[in-house]
Amino acid sequence: MTISRRKFVHGSAVVATALSTPLIMGAGGKKPRVVVVGGGAGGATAAKYLAKDSKGAIDVTLVEPTRKYYTCFYSNLYIGGFRDMDSIGHSYGNLAASYGINVVHDWASGIDRDKKTVRLAGGDTLPYDRLVLSPGIDFVDGAVPGWDLSAQNRMPHAYKAGSQTELLKRQVESMKQGGTYVMVAPPNPYRCPPGPYERVSMVAHVLKQKNPKAKILVFDPKKKFSKMGLFQEGWEKHYPG
């Protein structure tokens, strides 16, 4: 049975793993092999502790196309000017140097469950005894009426931290005086329920300093949201109106 990259990336908010059973030394005394797809918070943490807790008894390979991972958590503090971009960026050198993890910078393009292999976009194939899938989330092109992937450079979502976060910060800081910032909060369920409200709070902080006559409009399909009372109390105190 073969799984394409499209099939597993679109359901990628979860770590799918068969690590609940013990790994047994392979034929010829070879170490058992674990391949982790995705080097974000979930995948990198799984790879680190598999390597660390096994004390080198497991051969761990981490597949991640990017050279640096930017955390979505704390990215709102970057937008608000409380952190710089480097502080939310993490490279993979320490995973290799400190824990002996084999880091492969490539896309995982397919999985063959029967042969227990991961196919890479560059053409190589990685065999595994156990597989962890943690490739993160992304937008499905055309899933939102009137919006597609080509629009993200004009209307950055910044759900995936990095260049989108930097673009959003630049756009907020360069808004015309007295302009309007509009945010549409997603319906439940979605990743990080307080995230949209943290973000709009940081945008309000920036506009209060740089563009005090600007307006903020939030369109929200939910009647209640995470930490609603705390956010409303803070907005009334710091950004009334």
Predicted feature descriptions by range:
Residues 28-102, 187-229:
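Beta1-alpha1 glycine-rich phosphate/pyrophosphate-binding loop at the start
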Residues 106-114:
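A conserved short coil-to-beta-strand element within the FAD-binding core of flavoproteins
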Residues 135-210:
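Glycine-rich dinucleotide-binding loop and its adjacent helix/turn
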Residues 122-130:
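Core beta-strand elements of the Rossmann-like FAD/NAD(P) dinucleotide-binding domain
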Residues 21-29:
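Bacterial Sec-dependent signal peptides at the C-terminal "C-region" and cleavage site
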Residues 100-107, 240-241:
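A conserved beta-strand/loop element that lines the FAD pocket in flavoprotein oxidoreductases
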Residues 11, 134-135:
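Short, well-ordered coil/turn residues at beta-beta hairpins
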Residues 1-16:
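N-terminal secretory signal peptides and thylakoid transit peptides that target proteins
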